[in-house]
C-alpha cells in the first residue's frame, strides 16, 4: 500500500506556516503499515492541483489531501477532485445542520458561502468534523482511495484518528497490529549509537529500528507488526532489551518524554528540591523546568549570575578564587552549586558556567563548560564538557547535560 499526501494551500508554499499535517499523517500511516512515498505541496490553484493529482494517480493507491475544504473561493480541493473523478458535489445534511447550529449559537449571521463547507463528493463516506465545520470525506474510485481532510490541525488530527483511521482499516482490511516505541538517548552521537547496535540494525526485519538525530539527542523508533497486540509488544521488549544492554546508560526515556520532564519526574519521586546558579545558561535550565506542571514541588529558586560581581556579591564566590581560577573553572562551578543550594535551602544545587561563544573567554575556547552538582550532605561533583555548535546550541545542550547528569546521579542512588 503506497500513499501520497497532498497539502493544499499557498500559505504553505510561502512559508507562512509549517506543514505539520504531513508529518502527523506520515506517523499515523506508518503505524497502519502504509508506506508514504511522496509529500506534495500545492498552492490554491486549480490547474496545478489537478496536475499534482494526476501525477499522484500514477504512483500511489492512496492519496490524502489536507486543506482547501473551506468556504472561500480559493478553497478548491473538493471541486478539483469532483471534476477529475466525474462526481457531483452534494450537500451533507448533517454537516449543514451543524454549521447552522454553530452560527445560531454564536449569534452570527451565516453567509451563503458557508453552505459550501457542507458539500461532499457524491457516494463518499463522510468523516464528521467534531472540531470545526467542513467535514472530511473518503472514497474509492478506479482502484485508488482518496481522502480529503480539513487543513487546520485541530480539526484534521482528531478527524483522522477517529474516522479516517477506521475507514482505512476497513478499506484495506488492516487487521495486523502495528506497535511503535521510541527510545530517547543523550550523551552519545548518532554514529556512535549506530555503531554499538550495527548488527541489530543490519538484522532488522520485525521489529524495525529507525535512528534519528536532532537537538543534540538521538532517538530510535522501534516498530513491530503482528496479528496479536501482546506479541507485537513482546517483540518490541526483546529488541529493546538487546539495545539497552549495550547503550542503556544513555537512554533516558521513551516516546514524548524530554530530559526536563524526566528530571522533574525523578525529583518529585524522591521528594527532593533543586536550585540553580546559571551563568552560561542564563536561566535556561530553570525556564525549562518551571514550564512544566508540578515544578513548584521541586524548584526552590535560582540565580542568574552572569557577571563576576553577582557571583561574588550574591553567591559568595571569593574574589581571589575568581582572579586566580576564573569564572570558567571547576572550583567556581563547585562553589556556585554548593552556595546556591545552601542559599535556597534545596536538596540539590546545580551550576552552569562556561563559554557559549562565538569568542573565547578567559583563555577558554567556545564550548568549554563546567556543570556543578551539590547534594545536601555530600561533596559536590563537577563535570567538564567540550561542546561544539552555535551559541544557542551550546546553551541548550548544556542545560540538557545538567538534566542528564542529575538523572545519572539519581539512578545511581536507587
Curated annotation (Swiss-Prot):
Gene3D superfamilies: 3.30.70.2860, CinA-like, MoaB/Mog-like domain
CDD domains the record matches: cinA
Superkingdom of this protein's organism: Bacteria
Family: Belongs to the CinA family.
Descriptive protein name: Putative competence-damage inducible protein
